[in-house]
Amino acid sequence: MNQKNSLGLNKCFLDKIDPIDLFEVWMNEAKKTELNDPNALALATSDQNNFPSIRMVLLKDFNKDGFVFYTNLNSQKGNELKNNPKASMCFHWKSLLRQVRINGMVQKVSNKVADEYYSSRGYESRIGAWASKQSTVINNRDELLNSIEEYKKKYSNKNDVPRPEHWSGWNLIPTSIEFWLDGESRIHERLKYTKDTEGNWVKSLLSP
């Protein structure tokens, strides 16, 4: 690969492009090529003993202020984020041979934002937020299914299912964003944006 003639991240390094703008371009392209869930990401958190855990979640919104996902606040990831608000995200779009890694600090979204997103979910999903005590042990599958039916009876009006207090969103405020582009003979392209002490993005090309 001739890095000087690259039309990928080398060009982005030379141009004055904001990492959020670049992410939006890549996400929009992934929506056209990925068969399933282009907004899927691996979310890494860690417990009080610094032992990491990782799982797939879905990105539901992003802008200059951060990257938003929703979850049960009492789940493993919810509890870990309460105790240690540092987290990492990794997007991998196999169809485009691209990857994005994002590190940062999380904070809960406002009740207004959480309410608006929750109300946009389907009835079954809203009921599930009540019925599932995420990450806790259950005796069998029927226990969960019975809980779902109980909440369906309680909230039979599909237009009136309130958001549980234990269900909300987290906004990851990025401190660094790295873009990775596959290259021939494993000579990949890596472009990293890091926020300086004044909140400005500083770009660096990394060796593959």
From Swiss-Prot:
The cofactors named for this UniProt entry are: FMN
The protein's UniProt keywords, in alphabetical order, are:
Flavoprotein, FMN, Oxidoreductase, Pyridoxine biosynthesis
**Assigned protein family:** Belongs to the pyridoxamine 5'-phosphate oxidase family.
Q: How is the cofactor bound?
A: Binds 1 FMN per subunit.
Q: Subunit info?
A: Homodimer.
Does the UniProt entry include the keyword Oxidoreductase?
Answer: yes
Sum up the protein's function in the record's words.
Answer: Catalyzes the oxidation of either pyridoxine 5'-phosphate (PNP) or pyridoxamine 5'-phosphate (PMP) into pyridoxal 5'-phosphate (PLP).
Q: What general EC class does the enzyme of this chain belong to?
A: oxidoreductase
Q: Name one GO molecular function term.
A: FMN binding
Disulfide connectivity for this sequence is none
* HAMAP family named among the record's database cross-references: PdxH
Q: By what name is this protein known?
A: Pyridoxine/pyridoxamine 5'-phosphate oxidase
Recorded metabolic or biological pathway in which this protein acts: Cofactor metabolism; pyridoxal 5'-phosphate salvage; pyridoxal 5'-phosphate from pyridoxamine 5'-phosphate: step 1/1; Cofactor metabolism; pyridoxal 5'-phosphate salvage; pyridoxal 5'-phosphate from pyridoxine 5'-phosphate: step 1/1
Q: Which gene encodes it?
A: pdxH
Show the stretches that span the lipid bilayer.
Answer: none
List the source organism: Pelagibacter ubique (strain HTCC1062)
